[in-house]
């Protein structure tokens, strides 16, 4: 509890004790008024001061003004009627302050939780000087410097591991509890915690450009981007508060005057009491406080799961996502070619793979790398001679004196070698040894383990259509889409075509449905920007993703997409619950008050009670459960 909150708590306790004591003190008249006025000032002086400042600054119609007017009015009413019943006015202020303290504590707890979840800001960096480690501010470390990260310390800057190996806790960035292992030569990003081992890292970015700085900046600025709901509440409060003040004046003055004109009993005290109660009931605290808090908690809860949402406007838009468009490579697939099948004739499978890897050893093409990876042994280049690349067809070479052809069907046709057709999805490498067809190897982009389940979860979450965009051939794209259960495919696209396809989908979508585009953030910036919601996946270390997207998924697991949508819908559900609940209770109590069926105590519940319930509901957005 902060110092300001402690002072408020002490004031509440002192006032409560004073009220209990005053109930048993046999004092009347002026001494009684002074004693109760002292209790009132102890609990309400700050509200009176804020109300006064608001009037002087031209912002009279706020909750402080309503509370000050209602409670002072109750005091003057007790003085006027000489009843000596000052308890209600003080009780209203006391319970209002209890509600404010609770709200302040809840907001503070939410902020603390979010700070803990995003506790990735490094305090220092270790630089080695004269054989000793010196702690310096991360801002002072230049690009290319060597920093040392010891067990238990945060990685302060992005870089490459020069020496050492360790396990890293990346949970604050990705929401993933399993440690990530790094070794010499691996890229490493700031914000991770070194669990074991000493790492020497060569920095590749300044602190201001590092991943941790960009993420912190994103989270800190999220509250500045207001949602439609928050904008509505702001507009509502500007109209609502003056309207209820005018209604209270009409209730307390106009109604008695009207009754007087018709010769009815005026009952000034009764109607003024109703007007003051009306003011207490009307305070819009529950809405003004709980709606922004709901979004704040929702964004914080999402960040704990490795989902960074740039503002409450994007969180609200994400909740209306009905169409999700995927870029295939790197999003639904690994984006890395692998040997997925070896179909051989008489030659042994391992031997066929060995010939292919050796023949392709001079190439830097991804296909060559995937063959060498599948072979898994060190390449002995002395075994290979006469390597020749046949443009658009493949490679010819001599391996251990044998003439080897490795390429597509065109290469086989060029050398008049009959080959077997392959219906597997992927790139087919046909192999010929000494003029005889030896078989073929299938290389393809591997689908991520959770992609199919991710599509199913999206449909369960209410997404009506899934679309895949890819530059792959139609046959390959259709096969992937069928395997994953994707509704529509756009294949054989050039990079610029993707924006046009998204434009068409946006033009044809239902009016209130939003389109979300999911990419890996590397070359998708134009499409991420054009979609209603741009979602970048696997953004650890990707500046482009963090800059271009509205929602950033720190992990490359497609399951995170459905999780992000569910979090947004839970948050918006809480916002709607609070709006409906608050307005029903408020207007119900206002009607009861106007007809004289609710007293000041009911007014306190309608204000403070509703605010506490709404705040409790709002902080539910911090937690996400499957």
Residue ranges of model-derived segments:
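Soluble-to-membrane junctions at the N-terminal ends of transmembrane alpha-helices
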Residues: 1-17, 34, 48-76, 216-250, ...
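Juxtamembrane coupling segments of multi-pass membrane pumps/enzymes
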Residues: 65-66, 93-151, 172, 182, ...
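Conserved cytosolic catalytic loops of P-type ATPases
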Residues: 1, 116-209, 313-356, 398-399
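Membrane-water interface of transmembrane alpha-helices in multipass transporters/channels
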Residues: 29-37, 60-66, 81-92, 232, ...
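Transmembrane helix-loop-helix hairpins at the membrane interface
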Residues: 2-124, 226, 235, 242, ...
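P-type ATPase nucleotide-binding
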Residues: 339, 343-465, 474, 486-502
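Conserved catalytic phosphorylation-site environment of P-type ATPases
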Residues: 57, 63-71, 173, 273, ...
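Conserved ATP-binding TGD loop and adjacent catalytic N/P-domain core of P-type ATPases
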Residues: 399-401, 427, 433-577
């Amino acid at each position: 509890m902060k110092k300001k909150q402690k002072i408020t708590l002490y004031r509440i306790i002192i006032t409560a004790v004073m009220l209990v004591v005053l109930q048993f003190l046999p004092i009347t008249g002026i001494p009684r008024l002074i004693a109760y006025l002292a209790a009132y000032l102890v609990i309400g002086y700050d509200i009176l001061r804020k109300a006064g400042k608001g009037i002087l600054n031209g912002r009279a119609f706020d909750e402080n003004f309503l509370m000050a007017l209602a409670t002072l009015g109750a005091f003057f009413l007790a003085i006027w009627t000489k009843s000596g019943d000052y308890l209600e006015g003080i009780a209203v202020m006391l319970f209002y302050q209890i509600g404010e303290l609770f709200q302040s504590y809840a907001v503070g707890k939410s902020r603390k939780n979010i700070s803990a979840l995003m506790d990735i800001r490094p305090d220092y960096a270790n630089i080695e000087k004269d054989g000793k480690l010196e702690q310096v501010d991360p801002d002072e470390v230049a690009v290319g410097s060597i920093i040392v990260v010891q067990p238990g310390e945060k990685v302060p800057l992005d870089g490459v591991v020069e020496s050492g190996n360790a396990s890293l806790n990346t949970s604050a960035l990705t929401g993933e509890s399993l440690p990530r292992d790094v070794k010499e030569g691996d890229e490493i990003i700031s914000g991770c915690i070194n669990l074991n081992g000493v790492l020497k890292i060569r920095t590749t970015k300044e602190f201001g450009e590092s991943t941790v700085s960009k993420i912190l900046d994103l989270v800190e600025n999220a509250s500045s981007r207001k949602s439609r709901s928050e904008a509505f509440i702001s507009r509502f409060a500007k109209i609502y508060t003056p309207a209820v003040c005018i209604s209270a004046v009409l209730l307390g003055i106009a109604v008695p005057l009207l009754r007087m004109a018709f010769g009815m009993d005026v009952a000034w005290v009764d109607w003024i009491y109703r007007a003051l109660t009306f003011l207490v009931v009307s305070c819009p605290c529950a809405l003004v406080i709980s709606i922004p808090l709901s979004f704040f908690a929702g964004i914080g809860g999402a960040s704990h799961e490795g989902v960074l949402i740039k503002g409450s406007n994007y969180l609200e838009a994400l909740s209306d996502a009905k169409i999700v468009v995927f870029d295939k490579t790197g999003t639904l697939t690994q984006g890395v070619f692998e040997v997925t099948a070896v179909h051989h004739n008489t030659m042994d499978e391992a031997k066929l793979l060995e010939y292919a890897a050796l023949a392709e050893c001079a190439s830097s093409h991804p296909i060559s790398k995937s063959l060498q990876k599948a072979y898994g042994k060190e390449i002995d280049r002395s075994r290979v001679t006469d390597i020749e690349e046949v443009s658009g067809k493949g490679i010819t070479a001599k391996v251990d004196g044998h003439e080897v052809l490795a390429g597509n069907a065109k290469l086989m046709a060029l050398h008049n070698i009959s080959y077997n057709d392959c219906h597997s999805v992927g790139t087919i490498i046909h192999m010929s040894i000494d003029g005889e067809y030896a078989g073929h190897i299938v290389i393809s982009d591997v689908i991520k383990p959770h992609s199919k389940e991710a599509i199913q979860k999206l449909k369960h979450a209410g997404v009506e259509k899934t679309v895949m965009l890819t530059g792959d051939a139609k046959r390959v794209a259709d096969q992937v889409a069928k395997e994953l259960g994707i509704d529509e495919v756009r294949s054989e696209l050039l990079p610029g075509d993707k924006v046009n396809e998204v434009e068409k989908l946006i033009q044809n979508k239902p009016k209130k449905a939003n389109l979300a585009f999911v990419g890996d953030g590397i070359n998708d910036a134009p499409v991420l920007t054009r979609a209603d919601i741009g979602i970048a996946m696997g953004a650890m270390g990707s500046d482009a993703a963090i800059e271009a997207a509205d929602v950033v998924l720190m992990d490359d697991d497609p399951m995170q997409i459905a999780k992000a949508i569910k979090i947004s819908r839970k948050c918006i559900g809480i916002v709607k619950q609070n709006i409906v609940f608050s307005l029903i209770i408020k207007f119900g109590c206002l009607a009861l008050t106007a007809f004289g069926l609710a007293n000041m105590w009911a007014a306190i519940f309608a204000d403070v009670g509703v605010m506490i319930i709404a705040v409790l509901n709002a902080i539910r957005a911090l937690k996400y459960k499957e």
